[in-house]
Amino acid sequence: MNRLPSRAWAKAAPCPALALAALGLLGAQPCQAVTFGSEHGISGSVDSTLSYGFASRLQSPDCHLLGNDNGGCNTATHNELGRYYNLERGNGYANADINYSNADDGNLNYHKHDVFSQVLKGTHELSLRFGEGWSALGRVAWARDFKMDDTRRTDLEGPARRDATQRFDLLDLWLAKSFDLGDMPAKVKVGNQVISWGAELFVSGGINQINALSLPKYHTPGTQLKEVFIPAPMASFSLGLTDALNLEGYYQFKWNGYDVDPVGTYFSSADIAGEGRRAIYYPTGFVEGLQPGTCAGSPTGRCGDPLTSGLSHEQLVASGLAVPYGGERKPGNGGQYGLALRWMAESINTEFGLFYQRYHDKLPFIGYTARSNPDALVVDDYFINYGEDKDLFGVSMSTLVGPVAVAGELSFRPHDSVAIDPTVAFGQGLTGSYNRYSVFDTGVSKGFVEQRKWQADVNATYTFSGNDPLGFIPNALGASDGFLLAEVAVTRYPGLDTSGRVPYVLPDYSLPDRTSWGYVTEFGLNYPNLFGSGVTVTPQLDFSHDVKGTTPNAMPFVEGRRSLTASLLFNHRDRWKGGLQWVRYWGGGDNNLMADRDFVSGNISYSF
């Protein structure tokens, strides 16, 4: 009876739906570098930023997002997928309690008003210039969190504790050469680097996906934008074919994936993805629905994890009440590359871009093996899996419409990975009919199917003051200027089977939609030299709304999901910076695993 759910929504590893651009405001960007060298020799600069930050929970866990053994009140078998796969029809079993029971450690570990992060961190950068057009950059970051492992229910496992409390990361490390190729300016860069293509600002899933992200860093108070993107070992080039036409390309030497939140930490939304991952434990309601009376033999009369059942991990696995972790199957290091062609149409002051990328998935899926006894619904183990050899085609544009910077992009993925739960469907041993989506028939499931995906994005950036159309706002509120950013995106999976036959994965086992869309806005005002202090104060609001439709993998949209962040940012001559943030999540029903994770945070940093 070793069945387990897919955890592919852990792909989302949700983080606040705020502008990554805003991180540049929240964190300190060092401007007071120590410079050295001469014009004709080696010259360079050393930049460092030290920061301290904290974050505290503002609400108690919501029972709809917890396993029912842990005080939850989730939907269990009352779900859309269960209308197709259910015990009464004898063709499958979709009980969402197994999803929430294996996704709530981070939620249960911190109570309302708990300080879940108290972090001291630093970023250090060395930039060099030498010779004829040579340059180099090295950047490292470290962090020490004093509160993340102060948990209420489940101790952080060794790898999770190390990742959550002590980090040292090598970020950029590259060497570049600028030169002329005939009459064409060129540049080649080799080493750990970040490449940003496309036009998106806030919404993920478009063209800008060359580099993986570090979600733990995103969730760390005081994070700088350049720390969030994980540099990848690549060789890249740019070549100015004409004054208006530019060619760019890259080849990635080694694959790296998303860094997801360690299991049991505050923003972790999957107990089997990330450092500290553990076995999948079957909750009482799930087991009793299949085999009544099974859990009565445990010390507590319940199934679930060791704390709930009173049985050890080994006992649970041996009795078929848990499924062990079977390892990570990483993609190959080769086969990732891309080309970009940019054309500046000067007559209309608009840049157009064409893009192609060959890539491997950077976000994890959950695969399964079921070879020992599939007719008894035995799953041998689960493994972390990634799709390989994917293609992305994209176009973009950027221009000015009056004082407003407008940009947009359209991307197409002919074989996007869409998560399924192949343990929901019973195999032919029980149904008499072969089901290609059932791991009990295939023996091994990679945990996803492939679908065509389109995503379109349009965004605008507007800064205003005094006599501008929106200048009355800063004038009325005593500010010098303001800024407004807005983005709308839509995702389309034209071939998605919404009948329920394909067991797509969402936390509550509802079915995803072919079309989904949403928007994000950011608004702020600047008050320079407030009260003659030399401090620029910036109040800022960020709001996101997933308006209609839920995307497969719950990324980027979950219908009805919203978030709001109110920030108050301080900048004293680009040396001292700080901020206070209040973050609220709501909407999206039981698919919004962040709906009860409201928090407040603050940080202060010093750059030198």
Regions from the PLM with identified roles:
Residues 32-46, 59-61, 116, 126-136, ...:
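Short loop/turn motifs that connect adjacent beta-strands in outer-membrane beta-barrel proteins
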Residues 42, 116-120, 166-171, 229-233, ...:
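Residues that define the transmembrane beta-barrel architecture of outer-membrane proteins
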Residues 44-52, 136-138, 186-190, 247-249, ...:
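Transmembrane beta-strands of outer-membrane beta-barrel proteins
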Residues 52-58, 142-146, 192-196, 251-257, ...:
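Transmembrane beta-strands of outer-membrane beta-barrel pores
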Residues 63-106, 149-161, 211-220, 261-325, ...:
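Solvent-exposed loop segments that connect transmembrane elements
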Residues 133-276, 548-549, 557-562, 583-587:
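Outer membrane beta-barrel
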Residues 460, 596-608:
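Outer-membrane beta-barrel "beta-signal"
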